[in-house]
């Protein structure tokens, strides 16, 4: 089989939307090469530094690589993929010195190239995300989330995913009921289930994402707790008295439904919102307040922000 590698050079702020667009066009695998990851010298829990070199990363910004089966249909789609990515600027997503390149790769090369950037990521002292192909021995009481990052965005490496998981770890209580809006790979739903949630409703508008989430949920043996639904945000979701709503999506999307979040939450319920770039945090904060939510805490990692708010106790 012949494969094509789509390489996009863009900004860190654009990582999630670009990865989502590439996935929606049918990418079989997506890798994210961010120099910040190298500079952090991420160590695993045994003190080993993964053997990636400085030259594996771009000088600045982020390179996103996606792999597509080279079919006549894909070749015809190439201009549309580039146009869709460039149109992200209409949502105020900065693309930086946007570059879009398509290369041919052989079967063996594509199957391994994107995997070298994914290794176990320790999110908290209790939670570690492990790629499905990695052999990993957990310590006592360690929560392991297995993911196939090739299927949808949400691998655990992005700061917004990590911020959400840490917030879930802080706020989720045993037997809580959770809604995960824009579930992507299902990572936040799986984390919720493994932290003790009684039930989780995972929604995503994208059919590819819901299928990916279902596969990852089965991989983690949490299908008895998590229900996946293809749905636009919280539209037509009649659940109320929910303990936590979590949404790791773009700030512009969060602005569309804070009133729906308020209605879904029980008094005292928590809304964890991330996917918010720093310069848009104030706008989101004001929208949450206007919907009746009370800001509980704001956390930041790099340029990314998570806002934790609460429905007041009436």
Curated annotation (Swiss-Prot):
Primary location: cytoplasm
Disulfide partners: none
Chain positions recorded as S-adenosyl-L-methionine binding sites: 161, 182, 204, 248
The protein's role, per its UniProt record: Methylates ribosomal protein L11.
Family: Belongs to the methyltransferase superfamily. PrmA family.
Name of the featured protein: Ribosomal protein L11 methyltransferase
One Gene Ontology cellular component annotation held by this UniProt entry: cytoplasm
GO MF terms held by the record: protein-lysine N-methyltransferase activity
Intracellular or extracellular location(s): Cytoplasm
HAMAP family reported for this sequence: Methyltr_PrmA (MF_00735)
Protein EC: 2.1.1.-
Catalytic function, reaction form: L-lysyl-[protein] + 3 S-adenosyl-L-methionine = N(6),N(6),N(6)-trimethyl-L-lysyl-[protein] + 3 S-adenosyl-L-homocysteine + 3 H(+)
Keywords for the protein's UniProt record, in alphabetical order: Cytoplasm, Methyltransferase, S-adenosyl-L-methionine, Transferase
GO biological process: methylation
Superkingdom: Bacteria
């Amino acid at each position: 089989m012949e494969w094509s590698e789509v390489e996009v050079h863009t900004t860190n702020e654009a990582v999630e939307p670009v990865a989502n667009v590439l996935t929606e066009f049918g990418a079989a695998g997506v890798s994210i090469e961010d120099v910040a990851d190298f500079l952090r010298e991420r160590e695993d829990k045994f003190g080993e530094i993964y053997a990636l070199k400085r030259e594996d990363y771009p000088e600045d910004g982020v390179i996103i690589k996606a792999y597509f089966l080279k079919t006549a249909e894909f070749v015809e789609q190439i201009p549309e993929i580039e146009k869709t990515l460039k149109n992200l600027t209409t949502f105020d997503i900065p693309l930086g010195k946007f570059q879009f390149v398509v290369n041919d790769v052989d079967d063996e090369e594509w199957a391994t190239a994107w995997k070298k950037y994914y290794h176990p990521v320790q999110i908290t002292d209790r939670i570690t995300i492990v790629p499905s192909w990695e052999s990993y021995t957990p310590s006592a009481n360690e929560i392991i989330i297995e993911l196939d990052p090739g299927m949808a965005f949400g691998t655990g490496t992005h700061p917004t995913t990590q911020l959400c998981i840490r917030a879930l770890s802080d706020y989720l209580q045993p037997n809580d009921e959770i809604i995960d809006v824009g579930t992507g790979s299902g990572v936040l739903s799986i984390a919720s289930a493994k932290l003790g949630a009684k039930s989780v409703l995972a929604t995503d508008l994208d059919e590819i994402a819901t299928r990916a989430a279902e596969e990852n949920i089965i991989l983690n043996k949490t299908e008895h707790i998590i229900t996946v639904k293809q749905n636009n945000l919280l539209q037509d979701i009649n659940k109320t008295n929910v303990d936590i709503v979590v949404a790791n999506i773009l700030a512009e999307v969060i602005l569309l439904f804070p009133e729906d979040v308020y209605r879904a939450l029980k008094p005292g319920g928590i809304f964890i919102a991330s996917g918010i770039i720093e310069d848009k945090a104030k706008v989101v904060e004001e929208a949450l307040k206007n919907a009746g939510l009370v800001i509980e805490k704001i956390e930041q990692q790099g340029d990314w922000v998570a806002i934790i708010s609460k429905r007041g106790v009436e």
